[in-house]
């Protein structure tokens, strides 16, 4: 039985190319064209009567015969075989060096080269020293040892490769050359060489810009980790393994070529490297406290308060907010829409806030000199009336709100009151007839006495209230008529105060020049009055 095969050099290629279906040859050739055509490189197939067997044999012959050869070419181009060979040799050396407790080698390895066999010609593996001595050093481009006349190698070499010189020593008296086991001249791939050269050029330019900082940092990290790899950068000769090939010197660029920002970055990197090296060289470990998730927030707050970092953080946040608020787009419009600085409407249960928080708000704004914003809350006459009824019979201790304000007494006359105040005062009684009757009844008892104006200044700057009161000593809750609307020094619209003022603690007036500070407890109905067409306003002091 004759077989016609195309010898590609690889055994796997030959087995893949050979078909399992072999047609029986006739005893006599009827025609000269039916003779075996081994030289033509194809397998003749006789016509078969079975269609299924013919289709199956065609599928088997359709298999690509150069798949394994291309895979081997890939392994040689990527230096995978070289790496595997190195690993195997190192493992062999370690096994050969291992010894038992008695000092006997664990594995007895005899080199067939040194001790040849007398029965047959020795074609064994050379010694490890010989392999290391004759192995070529790694170059920029991986070589392709064409130990077999592969079709894939010859086809690819014909149009994309150039011939290179011999690698290593290939003398006839050497072990590799004499036995014919040495590698043939490799064929370097032109595209791969150009790719590696471009990459090396980028590394060279990057090394020039960073002024060896990258090499120092990498060498420092590798040294700290105890690694002795050959791929790490060195301080003495950065990129020296290809600088000679490219014709560039590894000299550092002068400082004049670098900008101020680059010099500062280089200085910071060098400083960081020194600090890291000093920390790694410490013989003792770091004395750090144990981490506790329950105590950590408190420790952080204590640390911030101890080093006074809260004001610094506040300044940083304020600067960031200022920059963002003043940022503008290309068309001139602000990046963020700036709203009015008024405090938004608080819910109706805002009186449940703690008095300390309410008292601290005007004090902080007064210290910073910011204008006080108008505090407007939702108001319901029914709820205020219920609260006032409940508070009348309760002792003074039930009152929760307390603050300090100044009273300034200024002698005024009813005739000197501006017309706007009377106009504003006429609107409120018309809207509430019951409150008007109460106001008239309360003022009849004090109409014979001369009137003085109580100049009430709230803790927040910019708000002044003038209240008409009677001369003498005021005791208990007394209702008074407003003489003028509140005087505002702000541009925001501010609703008028109601004409009733309930003071829960007695106080005495003083001469007009004095400003005594009086502590007063005001109920929830203090300064509450719905205004016609203006909404409502509730202010708790």
Swiss-Prot record:
GO CC entries: centrosome; cytoplasm
Top-level lineage group: Eukaryota
Region (Disordered): 346-397
Name of a matching Pfam family: DUF4702
Modified residues (Phosphoserine): 394
Compositionally biased intervals (Basic residues): 383-392
Calcium as UniProt keyword: no
Subcellular location: Cytoplasm, Cytoskeleton, Microtubule organizing center, Centrosome
Name the record gives this protein: Coiled-coil domain-containing protein 116
Organism: Mus musculus (Mouse)
């Amino acid at each position: 039985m004759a077989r016609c095969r195309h010898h590609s050099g690889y055994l796997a290629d030959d087995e893949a190319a050979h078909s399992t279906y072999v047609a029986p040859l006739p005893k006599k050739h009827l025609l000269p064209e039916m003779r075996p055509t081994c030289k033509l490189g194809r397998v003749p197939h006789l016509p078969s009567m079975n269609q299924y067997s013919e289709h199956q044999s065609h599928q088997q012959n359709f298999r690509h015969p150069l798949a394994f050869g291309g895979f081997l070419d890939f392994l040689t181009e990527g230096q995978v075989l070289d790496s595997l060979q190195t690993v195997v040799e190192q493992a062999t050396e370690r096994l050969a060096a291992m010894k038992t407790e008695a000092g006997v080698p664990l594995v007895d390895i005899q080199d067939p080269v040194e001790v040849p066999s007398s029965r047959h010609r020795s074609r064994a593996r050379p010694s490890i020293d010989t392999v290391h001595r004759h192995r070529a050093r790694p170059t920029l481009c991986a070589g392709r040892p064409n130990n077999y006349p592969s079709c894939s190698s010859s086809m690819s070499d014909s149009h994309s490769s150039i011939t290179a010189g011999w690698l290593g020593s290939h003398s006839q008296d050497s072990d590799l050359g004499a036995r014919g086991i040495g590698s043939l001249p490799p064929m370097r791939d032109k595209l791969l060489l150009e790719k590696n050269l471009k990459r090396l050029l980028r590394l060279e330019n990057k090394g020039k810009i960073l002024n060896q900082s990258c090499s120092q940092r990498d060498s420092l990290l590798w040294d700290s980790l105890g690694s002795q790899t050959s791929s790490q950068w060195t301080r003495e000769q950065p990129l020296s393994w290809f600088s000679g090939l490219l014709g560039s010197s590894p000299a550092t660029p002068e400082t004049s070529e670098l900008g101020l920002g680059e010099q500062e970055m280089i200085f910071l990197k060098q400083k960081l490297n020194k600090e890291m090296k000093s920390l790694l060289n410490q013989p003792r470990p770091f004395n750090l406290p144990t981490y506790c998730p329950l105590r950590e927030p408190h420790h952080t707050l204590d640390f911030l308060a101890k080093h006074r970092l809260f004001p610094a953080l506040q300044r940083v946040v304020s600067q960031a907010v200022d920059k963002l608020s003043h940022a503008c787009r290309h068309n001139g419009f602000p990046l963020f829409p700036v709203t009015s600085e008024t405090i938004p409407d608080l819910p109706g249960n805002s009186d449940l806030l703690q008095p300390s928080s309410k008292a601290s708000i005007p004090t902080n704004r007064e210290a910073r000199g910011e204008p006080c914003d108008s505090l407007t809350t939702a108001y319901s006459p029914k709820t205020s009336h219920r609260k006032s009824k409940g508070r009348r019979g309760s002792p003074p201790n039930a009152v929760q709100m307390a603050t300090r304000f100044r009273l300034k007494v200024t002698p005024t006359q009813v005739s000197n009151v501006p017309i706007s105040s009377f106009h504003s005062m006429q609107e409120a009684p018309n809207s509430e007839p019951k409150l008007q009757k109460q106001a008239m009844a309360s003022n009849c008892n004090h109409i014979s006495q001369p009137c003085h104006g109580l100049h009430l200044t709230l803790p927040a700057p910019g708000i002044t209230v003038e209240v008409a009161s009677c001369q003498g000593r005021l005791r208990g809750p007394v209702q008074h008529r407003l003489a003028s609307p509140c005087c505002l020094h702000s541009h925001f619209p501010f609703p008028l105060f109601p004409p009733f003022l309930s003071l829960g603690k007695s106080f005495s007036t003083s001469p007009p020049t004095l400003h005594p500070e009086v502590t007063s407890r005001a109920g929830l109905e203090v300064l509450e009055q719905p205004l016609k067409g203006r909404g409502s306003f509730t202010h708790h002091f």
